[in-house]
């Protein structure tokens, strides 16, 4: 079709070389490796982020060699229960977008409804615009985004904030990426009530709830970072603790695990402090024992 096989081959070869070079240049692999190392589990999320990164990279490359670019939508939706790594992954996503030159600064600004919506007439627009100003050049992460929309209250100022966000999403695509986050079911309802907004959110990532064994691994990783470890017995007790905690109200996955660890460290310190011998070994200082966890009120009920 006008192109000789040799010419086509040459172009193909040329493009292939560019892809590899471009990929190396962006240092995206480092971000993906960090993501892999820092977060336990989350396989589907990690795969999805890799897919999005690949799409964005290929699109950049197509632009470079003069091919049509589909102009990929950059706004995203991260759904899942609290403490499942949405904010952590959003930080990495911001870095990827920055490295691919889609945004100029690459920082993450995390907000909730209260940061965007005022309580009185005339307060919402300046509040939302102030947040947008801070987030320009980076990623705006709106946690529990569905609280922006209150269908029962016609005069709620949340819709004013949504209007402003919509304008920015459409007109300043070069400067700002928005990630809407929250529970899946509530987000689905939010999108259904705001089709204009939904149509501008191109990438959806769903964060699954962690299994107890994954939460134990997360705990062990967090402890290791702080140079602590669990005894074998403490491991089993902690797993038991997690299973009990999951059934309690306000359970927030890895965040609840982090809080539990903080409390276990407190009890550990107390135990060490009360030891009859005031000479302690390094192992005393680093080892969390079963009793440090068993003293949690969860085991007294
Ligand atoms: N898979 C994981 N491996 C290791 N640490 C994790 C993992 N998931 C979450 N964490 C840690 O748990 C804490 C909470 O995670 P993060 O804030 O990213 O969750 P979130 O889904 O954004 O929660 P929320 O929506 O409630 O703000 C962070 O300290 C994070 O490092």
Curated annotation (Swiss-Prot):
Location within or outside the cell: Plastid, Chloroplast
Main subcellular localisation: plastid
Taxonomic source organism: Cyanidium caldarium (Red alga)
Functional note: Necessary for the expression of RuBisCO.
Residues that coordinate or bind ATP: 80-87
GO CC annotations on file: chloroplast
SMART domains noted in UniProt: AAA (SM00382)
Name of this chain's protein: Protein CfxQ homolog
Keywords, alphabetical: ATP-binding, Chloroplast, Nucleotide-binding, Plastid
Family, per entry: Belongs to the CbxX/CfxQ family.
MF annotations from Gene Ontology: ATP binding; ATP hydrolysis activity
Positions in coiled-coil regions: none
Gene: cfxQ
Annotated PANTHER family: AAA-TYPE ATPASE FAMILY PROTEIN / ANKYRIN REPEAT FAMILY PROTEIN, AAA-TYPE ATPASE FAMILY PROTEIN _ ANKYRIN REPEAT FAMILY PROTEIN
Organismal lineage: Eukaryota, Rhodophyta, Bangiophyceae, Cyanidiales, Cyanidiaceae
């Amino acid at each position: 079709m006008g192109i000789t096989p040799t010419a086509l081959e040459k172009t193909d070869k040329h493009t292939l070389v560019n892809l590899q070079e471009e990929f190396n240049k962006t240092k995206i692999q480092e971000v993906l490796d960090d993501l892999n190392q820092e977060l336990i589990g989350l396989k589907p999320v990690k795969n999805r982020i890799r897919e999005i990164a690949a799409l964005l990279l290929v699109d950049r490359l197509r632009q470079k060699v003069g091919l049509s670019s589909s102009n990929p939508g950059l706004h995203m939706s991260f759904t899942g229960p609290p403490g499942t790594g949405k904010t952590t992954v959003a930080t990495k996503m911001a870095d990827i977008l920055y490295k691919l030159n889609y945004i100029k600064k690459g920082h993450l600004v995390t907000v909730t409804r209260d940061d965007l919506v005022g309580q009185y007439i005339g307060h919402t627009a300046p509040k939302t615009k102030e947040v947008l100003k801070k987030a320009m050049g980076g990623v705006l992460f709106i946690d529990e985004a569905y609280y922006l929309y209150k269908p029962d209250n016609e005069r709620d100022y949340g819709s004013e904030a949504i209007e402003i966000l919509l304008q920015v999403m459409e007109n300043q695509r070069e400067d700002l990426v928005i990630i809407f986050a929250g529970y899946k079911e509530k987000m689905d309802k939010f999108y259904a009530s705001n089709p204009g907004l939904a149509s501008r959110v191109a990438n959806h990532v769903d964060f699954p709830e962690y299994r107890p064994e994954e939460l134990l691994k997360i705990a062990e990783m967090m402890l290791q970072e702080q140079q602590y470890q669990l005894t074998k017995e403490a491991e089993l007790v902690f797993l038991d603790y997690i299973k009990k905690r999951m059934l309690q109200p306000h359970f927030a996955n890895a965040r609840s695990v982090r809080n539990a660890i903080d409390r276990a460290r407190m009890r550990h310190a107390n135990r060490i402090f009360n030891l009859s011998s005031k000479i302690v070994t390094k192992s005393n200082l680093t080892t969390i024992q079963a009793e440090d966890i068993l003293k949690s009120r969860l085991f007294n009920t």
